[in-house]
């Protein structure tokens, strides 16, 4: 059995795993145990009342957090014509078609998000085996296949997160950095939960958002009392 680090022992001692914390208290607890070596991300796990085995109950989408994620995001765009200048003006880091596809085939993937206009999918479709496993394949459900590439680039740059439930019906994503204020993290979490509630499948029955837990990159999860949100 792996030996617990001094930090993990402190976290286990300081976090009551049976308690649901008021959101501001939960964030205070997280900040007590953050690393001094780097600024950790604040992540969230949301347990949904869905049957993930049923395709019509899976939840997938994207939303822009009001205070962003604290991360610098590099965006690659597949498009042509007038959209090229629009994408560049919006802040895209890489813009192209076949030339960009060739870079990716060579393993040159210095980007975090891929966006494509519909007329570029004939090129992007050839990259499915490369982009798919990395979670980078453009998809209209999360707004990364769109005729308005400029807006998609701006969203990605301004803190858009993409979410998708895992096989256990849990959404895992980030809501900011440990150096964000409690209010910023709370408002980001509220924005995510509002987006998830809006995306509730029609076939999902009962309580939809069942449990919300927040954690830092290397910390333990802290359950959040939803009534405090």
UniProtKB/Swiss-Prot annotation:
Family that this chain belongs to: Belongs to the universal ribosomal protein uL1 family.
Gene3D superfamilies noted in UniProt: 3.30.190.20, 3.40.50.790
Origin superkingdom: Bacteria
SUPFAM superfamilies: Ribosomal protein L1
Gene Ontology molecular function, alphabetical: rRNA binding; structural constituent of ribosome; tRNA binding
Keyword Membrane recorded: no
Listed name of the protein: Large ribosomal subunit protein uL1
């Amino acid at each position: 059995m792996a030996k617990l680090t001094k930090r993990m022992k402190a976290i286990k001692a300081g976090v009551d795993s049976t308690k649901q914390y008021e959101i501001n208290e939960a964030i205070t607890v997280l900040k007590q145990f953050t690393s001094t070596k780097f600024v950790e991300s604040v992540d969230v796990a949301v347990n949904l009342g869905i049957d993930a085995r049923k395709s019509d109950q899976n939840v997938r989408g994207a939303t822009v957090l009001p205070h962003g994620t604290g991360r610098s995001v590099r965006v690659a765009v597949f498009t042509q014509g007038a959209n090229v200048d629009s994408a560049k003006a919006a802040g895209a880091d890489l813009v192209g078609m076949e030339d960009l596809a060739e870079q990716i085939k060579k393993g040159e993937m210095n980007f975090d998000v891929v966006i494509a206009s519909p007329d570029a999918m004939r090129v992007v479709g050839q990259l499915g085996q490369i982009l798919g496993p990395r979670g980078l394949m453009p998809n209209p459900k999360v707004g990364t296949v769109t005729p308005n590439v400029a807006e998609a680039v701006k969203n990605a740059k301004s803190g858009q997160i993409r979410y998708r439930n895992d096989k256990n019906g849990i959404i895992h994503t980030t809501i900011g950095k440990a150096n964000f204020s409690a209010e910023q993290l709370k408002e980001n979490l509220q924005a995510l939960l509002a987006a998830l509630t809006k995306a509730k499948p029609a076939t999902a029955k009962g309580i939809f958002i069942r449990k919300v837990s927040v954690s830092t990159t290397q910390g333990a999860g802290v359950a959040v009392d939803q009534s405090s949100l």
